[in-house]
Amino acid sequence: MTNIHTDKILILDFGAQYTQLIARRIREIGVYCEIWAWDHDPSEIAGFGAKGIILSGGPESTTLPGAPVAPQEVFDSGLPVFGICYGMQTLAAQLGGATEAADQREFGHAEVDVIAADALFAGLTDHAGAPRLNVWMSHGDHVSQVPPGFTITATTDRIPVAAMSNEDKRWYGVQFHPEVTHTLQGQTLLRRFVVDICGCQTLWTAANIIDDQIARVREQVGDDDVILGLSGGVDSSVVAALLHKAIGDKLTCVFVDTGLLRWQEGDQVMAMFAEHMGVKVIRVNAADRYFAKLEGVSDPEAKRKIIGNLFVEIFDEESNTLANAKWLAQGTIYPDVIESAGSKTGNAHVIKSHHNVGGLPQHMKLGLVEPLRELFKDEVRRLGVELGLPRTMVYRHPFPGPGLGVRILGEVKREYAELLAKADAIFIDELRKADLYDKISQAFAVFLPVKSVGVVGDARAYEWVIALRAVETIDFMTAHWAHLPYDFLGTVSNRIINELRGVSRVVYDISGKPPATIEWE
């Protein structure tokens, strides 16, 4: 079997918001890579076996004392090195060049003039055939003097060194961000570094990843049974499909129907996995328990804890009926792993602690099976399609773990959940019919616990309000509200008010993130 981890790239993270995007772009090329904090134990670099090293951007300044630096082992390794933004600045500063703070930060589009055609830039031109690239800049400092042995390969009208290289050492640096789509030929530059300069084979494909994970899972669990909490979300669905292919009937899924899922989602999950794919699924209808526990609770965090703790309790009860289960499968993905690892100095970014690990009782004493822990979300989706899951399921918009419990403001009641699920289904149905669903990042309805006066027929009505939310985003860290057509919003509003008894008003949320969050609670 092909070893898909033989050719790989190491990315040292200096805290940039785009670091994970660098890794995703390299994976798209077909090469495995990992992200390590810049202050990771340098003695492990040689043992990792990378064919090249990328130094990411970051928010710090190389002109200040104590700024993050690349380990000397990077330069002693003999490997190709590619510094991006801050990565190029520390490359220059550490190797005998100089950096300085700019009079004004440069953020946004820029034109870079190629003045020396090295292995990165040879033959690249703009649409008019000139040796010029449209790129995305985001920096405050810049390289003012290149180190000995380096050549300036690109410049702009604002900074003297937009790119540099030492081709003898195979060390390269660019001040701009090739990983973002605004840099029109950025993927070409990354491919040239990873494939042409580092010599990596493009073995990281969905089909190869599936074969690799099937072999790993079989080796890990042997003849033991595995249990999986199936939620209907993308990650757990792909884990279920992958493990079913790997170990067949040795997998048992536990699907907890909380009463807080999307409209008819429980039936859809059972139809897909139990009936269509033949996966063993235990369906637990727990809506009564959830609504009883949530009665009188309005605080969002309290609701989240109740919903999460009750899931653990129910999952624990069901797992006790599966005496032969020795392993617990989880949908941990690579960003969770990165966020948990963090930086030992605290200078690299740490976003949150990992939300899967530690969520189940200690006494369960089950080994962990995490077949997606090397993958980004977009890779998980591609695996899902390769495994035969419906595209409509694999590319569904994100849905919060607590479900409708955090889309019903205030106290959660069964009647509110049923009303909201139907309103949400109407919104999503109309988005699909208008060919808008795949053009936005996330859309959903929210139940507001306030009543508004309306007129139904000739009678006065005093009924509930539904809010609609749709956003466009790249990373969900920031988001813009989606500018949906007025006629479309009118159609959705009319359907919700006409088809659902108890709703008299529909409003549209036009808040960005920040200052608002995407979810209302």
Swiss-Prot record:
InterPro entries: Class_I_gatase-like, GATASE, GMP_synth_C, GMP_synth_GATase, GMP_synthase, GMPS_ATP_PPase_dom, NAD/GMP_synthase, Rossmann-like_a/b/a_fold. Transmembrane segments: none annotated. GO terms for molecular function: ATP binding; GMP synthase activity. PANTHER family: GMP SYNTHASE [GLUTAMINE-HYDROLYZING], GMP SYNTHASE-RELATED. The keyword ATP-binding applies. The keyword Nucleotide-binding applies. Residues 204-396 form the GMPS ATP-PPase domain. Catalyzes the synthesis of GMP from XMP. This is GMP synthase [glutamine-hydrolyzing]. Homodimer.
